[in-house]
């Protein structure tokens, strides 16, 4: 790393659709985890008089003021759609959460596979020109490799499902196979929206945002809800009643399904009117795009990653069952659900950025000044 300074701890930032995970290379877990759906501005002029009004609020502070702020979502389906707001999130990450001067630390960023090239260049430009970082690197296809490495494997297929997007990434002997990577715009936020829609059909009125719904979804860990005929329960067993208090004080009683754990929508997108393959079919289709000689290794190493695979009882059992039904009968199916998978991408990045062998991989400030933002395509994978 030409300009990075090897004695300085690199920063690792995993900017997801729903949450930002940030911290220092070499650490076991991120120091900061906060919502990335969170840049807020006053809805009405004058409503925050005397509250020390700012132009924008980020993270938990914006969320706490959601009743009087207009929340904005700078990342949609894993891709940055509002760069001004994304810049504010990065500023908040460095100065408020990690409390560091970014010009003193190399920065490792992650991005969704199949991210548009223009977005990669824009993020590179912001890091070097706005935050003056000494060096940086952007993980794309290699991002999913980290989840695989964290499980002790170098060959397998990673199903990464977060808040905004899901991906299947086949990896053989440490290398992602780009022709077989598939993207599915179905993830945690769709489950949240589905929950909100069904509760609205039941007659509940909300003053809270989808953020509150998201917390309820995670807390109750529903498989499916017995509130709408459009929501089928193919694997439902014991019904239980649970109460949940929304941030606005409203108490909702939900008939949740105990037994499975992973929301059925991920396997049956048609439940929310989406014409798409489920995560099991997407995983299968991704494997089928690979050479026939390596499919056995992929079927035997299906690794789950991301927050939307964390529901108790979880995608593990459902994925095993569904893939077994799709695959040849002679094929041995093994699904792996590492306990740390919610942060496996960040943890992998932390390990990678602290390796001595990685130091030559950084894009230095000098290289950026010489080649411009397009250098990210030559050096980052």
Curated annotation (Swiss-Prot):
Reaction(s) this enzyme catalyzes, per UniProt: ATP + H2O = ADP + phosphate + H(+)
Annotated localization: Cytoplasm, Cytoskeleton
Keyword Zinc: no
Leading EC class: hydrolase
Cellular-component GO terms for this entry: cytoplasm; cytoskeleton
UniProt EC number: 3.6.4.-
Keyword Hydrolase tagged: yes
Protein name: Actin-2
Organism: Daucus carota (Wild carrot)
